[in-house]
Design a protein with these regions (language model features):
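Short, small-residue-enriched loops and turns at beta-alpha junctions
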Residues: 12, 16-17, 50-53, 85-92, ...
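Active-site beta->alpha loop and helix N-cap motifs at the rims of alpha/beta catalytic domains
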Residues: 46-131, 135, 143-164
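Surface-exposed amphipathic alpha-helices with a cationic face
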Residues: 64-72, 126-140, 194-202, 257, ...
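Catalytic alpha/beta core domains of metabolic enzymes, predominantly
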Residues: 181-355, 359-391
């Protein structure tokens, strides 16, 4: 078997790109061939796949069980990302809650818990590993992988990571999970760290997880592969199906196989994972369609925004949580606007991230991963608000930042601004910073949750109901699920052009008495529907990112930039150039075909393509048109 293996990080694709908005059934329906591709494992749970299911009005346990049970039925090794003591929430929990949660997931069929704490504090991981060991002794097939959070950060050094690795293994973790939620990472750092981990821990394998936000993930993965294959060791890379890859998620499994096979070192290119291309293709259209339906939840690309995020070490999507703060976006839009017009969301985000890069040092450079990422960005937004209204940057502190500053979330960096710590201590009415309380030393929470549920009308509360009550903190939601009165969020309505056309029986007939009158819906369906529109949009974005030199290519594979660029140009040319023929083959008359492609009016195929492409980034459609024209000019000349 190949030394280089893949984990399909499905959960994070849905979370990072689509905001955990699709239901479990939508995910399953869109990815029918996941188990056939040949990946070593699939991450099906964890992260926001609990609280956000609930916030969307869904019964979180039904959603989780549906996903895990489906993949278990197909014999898939499954993992879940778990936030140590924080589980799938934003506050540390006592051991009785942790134990019951771990046992529930073990019973469902989760095999690997990738357990992390953003500041690499081992105290916050004690509960999960203890519960996993108890589950193992009860016969469950489950392990806890020890996570080391990494990024370009003065708090994160090779030496500190190695010291933390010793603690992880001593605690009983099995293998290492190198996690970079921000994607701000140096491939050289990855190579040195993985080399040292393999040398110092010869019995432990490594999985690496890097987001694609800043284009550094492929080079970091190859750096880890070099360290592994030089030693004949296994390395697992977190990848996405091509239709869920890129942007703020992870690299495409197809792209990574290409990089591995193209690598000049035989030790690497001979260890490419063997994936089933037919199985990958088998879910391409349905996943692109899912991504199209939930496209409004994806961040829009601009080089200026990415630059601001990069300087802030921002994890993609952290700013989305700001929209839930009453009045914040409206006030920032007003204060940043010009000529009595509100600033758009892109402008607001850029300003927030510029502020974030400014305050990181005062905050002690917290690692940009949950819950620190959302809390840092939340403080940046509030500090920007204060600055624009002439107040001190830290006039008020974001609630999550207060908890971090006083030690309630774990380790506090030495470099933190002591004045901010004093302010947070005062806000919390404390005398000093708090010592982090290990989960086993916290008072049990399940008995109180049970009592509250009984008082609310649940006669015999289940373990799952008690866990939801504690973790989500929304008693009304738990009761609604119990009484089956919860109202799950409905899927977004598609734009008119992407909706199902009228049936033949309902179509009007032209004056000639025989020609069916067809509208834009028929034309879009004929060319491939929303899946083709989304594929065009993703390829357009990829072209722009390559043009902006977003991607860092591994040494010896720099030529792939031109190959990837030209391959996208060719595919886009074929997709766009075949429209007339497709319409003709589908029975459109010449006049109907011309009408559907006219450039002098609205509601034509190219307007629909423009709408799809510009959702990925303002002005992206015009960029693609110019790129295609430039390519034709070069060919003709």
């Amino acid at each position: 078997m190949s030394l280089i293996r893949f984990q399909d990080i499905l959960r994070d694709g849905i979370q990072s790109l689509l905001g955990t908005n699709p239901s479990a059934q939508e995910i399953i329906d869109a990815y029918p061939t996941a188990h056939l591709i040949g990946n070593d494992s699939i991450q099906t749970a964890g992260g926001t796949f609990f609280d956000l299911f609930a916030k969307k009005g869904r019964n979180e346990w039904e959603e989780i069980e549906k996903l895990i049970t489906y993949f278990k039925k197909h014999g898939v090794k499954q993992s879940a990302l778990i936030r140590g003591d924080f589980l799938f929430g934003y506050d540390p929990q006592p051991y009785d809650v942790i134990r019951e949660m771990v046992f529930e997931y073990a019973k469902l069929g989760i095999n690997i818990l990738q357990s992390f704490h953003g500041m690499n504090d081992p105290r916050a991981l004690i509960g999960v590993i203890k519960a996993v060991q108890e589950a193992q002794s009860n016969g469950y097939d489950i392990i806890a992988q020890g996570t080391i959070c990494i990024e370009d950060n003065p708090n994160i050094t090779i030496q500190k990571c190695l010291e933390f690795a010793v603690e992880l293994i001593d605690m009983g973790h099995h293998g290492f999970y190198l996690k970079s939620a921000s994607g701000r990472l140096d491939p050289k750092f990855v190579y040195i760290l993985t080399s040292n981990l393999y040398d110092k821990f010869p019995d432990q394998n490594i999985t690496i997880h890097v987001h694609s936000t800043y284009g550094k993930a492929p080079a970091c993965y190859i750096a880890a592969a070099m360290a592994a294959t030089e030693r004949g060791r296994i390395i697992t890379m977190d990848v996405q199906h091509p239709a869920l890859s890129g942007s703020t998620s992870q690299p495409s499994m197809n792209k990574m196989v290409g990089l591995i096979r193209n690598h000049p070192d035989k030790k690497i290119n001979s260890n490419a994972p063997k994936l089933d291309a037919g199985a990958i293709k088998g879910s391409m259209r349905s996943l692109f369609s899912l991504r199209f339906r939930y496209r409004d939840y994806e961040s829009s690309y601009s080089s200026e925004l990415v630059g601001a995020m990069h300087d802030a070490r921002a994890a993609g999507g952290a700013s989305a949580t700001l929209k839930s703060i009453p009045g914040l976006v409206e006030n920032l839009g007003r204060l940043l606007g010009r000529n009595h017009e509100m600033a758009d969301w892109n402008t607001i985000q850029i300003a927030i991230y510029k502020m974030q890069s400014k305050i990181l040092k005062n905050l002690g450079e917290p690692t940009q991963v949950t819950p620190y990422a959302a809390n840092t960005t939340g403080q940046a937004a509030i500090s920007l608000w204060h600055q624009l209204e002439g107040r001190d940057l830290y006039y008020t502190l974001y609630p999550g930042i207060i908890n971090y500053l006083v030690g309630l979330h774990g380790k506090i960096p030495e470099s933190i601004d002591k004045a901010l710590v004093k302010k947070a201590i005062k806000v919390k009415n404390l005398d000093r910073t708090e010592e982090y309380i290990i989960s086993t030393d916290r008072p049990n929470a399940m008995p109180l949750a049970k009592e509250i549920l009984i008082q609310a009308g649940v006669k015999n509360p289940t373990t799952r109901q008690m866990l939801s009550s504690v973790l989500i903190g929304d008693l009304d939601h738990v009761l609604q699920c119990y009484f089956k009165t919860n109202k799950p969020q409905q899927a977004p309505e598609l734009p008119f052009y992407a909706q199902e056309p009228s049936s033949d029986e309902k179509k009007y007939i032209a004056r000639d008495g025989k020609t069916q009158i067809r509208d834009i819906r028929d034309a879009i369906k004929a060319i491939g529907g929303t899946s083709v529109l989304q594929e065009i949009a993703e390829r357009a974005l990829h072209l722009k990112q390559l043009s902006d030199n977003l991607y860092i290519f591994p040494l010896g594979e720099e030529s792939l930039k031109d190959k990837w660029y030209n391959a996208n140009i060719l595919k886009l040319s074929l997709l766009l150039g075949s429209i007339s023929k497709i319409l003709e083959n589908d029975g459109f008359t010449v006049l109907q075909s011309l009408s559907m492609q006219r450039s002098w009016g609205k509601n034509n195929i190219h307007d629909c393509i423009k709408d799809s492409v510009d959702k990925k980034g303002a002005g992206l459609y015009d960029f693609v048109v110019e790129a295609l024209a430039d390519c034709k000019f070069k060919i003709n000349s």
